[in-house]
Amino acid sequence: MSSSASTIVAIASAAGIGGVGIVRLSGAQSVQIAAQLGIARMQPRHAHYARFRDGQGAVIDDGIALWFNAPHSFTGEDVVELQGHGSPVLLRQLVARCIELGARQARAGEFSERAFLNGKLDLAQAEAIADLIAAGDLRAARAARRALDGVFSRRVDAVADTLTRLRIHVEAAIDFADEPLDTLGGNQLRDGLGQARNVLAQLLRDAERGRKLRDGLHAVLIGPPNAGKSSLLNALAGSDRAIVTDVAGTTRDTLHEAIQLDGFELTLVDTAGLRDGGDAIEREGMRRARAELERADLALVVLDARDPQAARDAIGDAIDAVPRQLWIHNKCDLLGNAVSLDANAIAVSAVTGQGLEQLHIRLRALALGDGVDSVEGEFSARTRHVQALRRAEQHVDAADLELGFEQLELAAEELRLAHEALGEITGKLSADDLLGKIFSSFCIGK
């Protein structure tokens, strides 16, 4: 079923000048509008050479027209693509002519929205289109491609189906409330719930990895002045991004630099050194450093290997809330003897490069967690997906608790809420305002 009676049009090719430009139409009037442009007797899935004409019969451009008939198209509607020269002036003129003939300018993401509303793909797959377009590296692109192919959605649907079966079992038990739960297969029900919980937990871990692949991680370099934070950022970035001097307090503001770790993006944040005192500007820099820690995924505590206690005194409890930490003993080349370090510490020299390869390995492991080399089956995910999975997990845990007290009605409600949370991921249960927010972030021609 079509999502709208209107026919929409937009430039579908990338902005700017190019060899080829594409204008896309979708809706019931697409073929009629194409005919009025000068493209007669079109056949579905055949390329037609044509001259695209304005209202006075003058040629706007010439090129290829393609008709994808409903429902065998991306949107599920009649779709016509006009491929001409990649001149923004000509493409805008062609869009204007289509609007004169009855189409309207498409909203951002409206083609993908119609594909979703017409059942051509689910919401997670639609989001994967935007992720594929925006992918910053090959690994992220492949993960987005798998999400677009439905790898993520099928796993979500499998868990949702399991919860539905368990809920049916609980609802049936409610009808026999006078019977003890064990006589109604209560042990089997709890076992099934435990298995569903394990599958959901693994899916949540994989989705969190997918979110990291899509968004990257935020790693904050923190420590006392002159520990070598800026030198380390430059060494990891492979360029002189940060100013390095022997003067304590040189870094006054935060500096962000994205690096690639085997196809994974890690944003390093250089910050002002933490210490007591300092002038007003330096104190503001330290305030910003602590603010960066509040949203950090990873704290890289950089200290002078000759005086590690100074870093601990300067930092105090500033990094306690950061989930992952790595203590980096910099300037290890200045030590006469090797030092024994804890498991969450590493010795490096930003100047000589000693230990940097091992640091890359540790950063990669901290970024993606266990199984960093296992890319098979990776899919892209978003923060909202992870949040929905966490809610589902919480409701499954609550259902298990209620079953333990034989509170069947409450257990059934928790299972319903878990199922609802999963439905938000694929769009089977999504509010209109959520859909509007998601599709408005897409390109105009998608």
UniProtKB/Swiss-Prot annotation:
GO BP, one annotated term: tRNA methylation
Q: Name one GO molecular function term.
A: GTP binding
Q: Does the keyword Oxidoreductase apply?
A: no
What are its E.C. numbers?
A: 3.6.-.-
Quote the record's binding site residues for GTP. 226-231, 245-251, 270-273
- Quote the record's binding site residues for (6S)-5-formyl-5,6,7,8-tetrahydrofolate: 24, 81, 120, 446
Which cofactors? K(+)
Q: Which residues bind Mg(2+)?
A: 230, 251
Keywords attached to this Swiss-Prot or TrEMBL record, sorted alphabetically, are:
Cytoplasm, GTP-binding, Hydrolase, Magnesium, Metal-binding, Nucleotide-binding, Potassium, tRNA processing
In what residue span(s) does the TrmE-type G domain sit?
Answer: 216-368
Q: Which family does it belong to?
A: Belongs to the TRAFAC class TrmE-Era-EngA-EngB-Septin-like GTPase superfamily. TrmE GTPase family.
Q: What is the recorded function of this protein according to its Swiss-Prot or TrEMBL entry?
A: Exhibits a very high intrinsic GTPase hydrolysis rate. Involved in the addition of a carboxymethylaminomethyl (cmnm) group at the wobble position (U34) of certain tRNAs, forming tRNA-cmnm(5)s(2)U34.
Assembly, in brief, is: Homodimer. Heterotetramer of two MnmE and two MnmG subunits.
Q: List the protein's name.
A: tRNA modification GTPase MnmE
Query: Gene encoding it?
Result: mnmE
